[in-house]
Amino acid sequence: MITFTLCLLALIAGYFIYGRFIERVFSPDDRKTPALTRADGVDYIPLPTWKIFMIQFLNIAGLGPIFGAIMGAKFGTASYLWIVFGSIFAGAVHDYLAGMLSLRHDGESLPEIIGRYLGLTTKQVMRGFTIILMILVGAVFVAGPAGLLAKLTPDSLDTTFWIIVVFAYYIFATLLPVDKIIGKIYPLFAVALLFMAVGILVMLYVNHPALPEIWDGLQNTHPDAVALPIFPIMFVSIACGAISGFHATQSPLMARCMTSERHGRPVFY
């Protein structure tokens, strides 16, 4: 439990110390944000900061960070180091800068921002790459929840039914103004996720289960360690739990709803 506690403290310290350093590098100011200058009642809508945080939290803490960290834990104490240092120095920095760059560029998505500086060809390549990734991730994010819901209703509603329901929800959430579905439902899901995280944390400190310590060594404890070495498999398994460039596709959604650049660190980092 000592290593686990130190890792938690390191993540908190990383936000306040290194996060503040990155914020000073970017230098947020008091200029008007796209939510105010380009308000359209659909995508560009000012939202409360707490709600933006909840939505962004849910955008980041999806299937990847949760299941990835669980699978990555099989590799032993090395996963502690990758999650902590990867999050502080790579993942959080990337997500913060991606969101702030969008905030500075009229809420544009990354392909459009890239096109400003690297030209039309690069923008089109990034658009194509993003579309492919969105299709792959979208398929997983439809099939995954549908499969879990189908297990809860094995005698009445099958996987196909839940795929249709989840897919329909995604379509409506995409087409309707951001404050109608995403702004109302996402914070509820985020509260549920935070409640579960706090519950697990309390359980760990109440029951004191045996957890590996960093001084026990960094050996690969995966059951199939020969076929699945720490490098590169652990880094791929815990990609979203430490760094994932794909998160940058979500940050512009909330950059279009922020009313101050100074809210960037608590929202994105």
Task: Give the location of each predicted region.
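Membrane-interface alpha-helices at helix entry/exit sites of multi-pass transporters
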Residues: 77-83, 112, 116-131, 257-269
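Membrane-water interface regions at transmembrane-helix termini and the short interhelical loops
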Residues: 101, 112, 141-153, 167-189
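Hydrophobic alpha-helical segments and their helix-loop junctions in multi-pass secondary transporters
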Residues: 138, 142, 146-164, 174, ...
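Hydrophobic, membrane-embedded alpha-helices of multi-pass small-molecule transporters
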Residues: 48-64, 203-209, 219-269
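Flexible loop linkers connecting adjacent transmembrane helices
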Residues: 20-45, 69-71, 93-122, 256
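Membrane-interface "cap" regions at the ends of multi-pass membrane proteins
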Residues: 10-66, 263
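Extracellular loop-to-transmembrane helix junctions
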Residues: 2-19, 72-102, 111
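Small-residue-rich segments of transmembrane alpha-helices in multi-pass membrane proteins
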Residues: 117-118, 124-125, 188-203
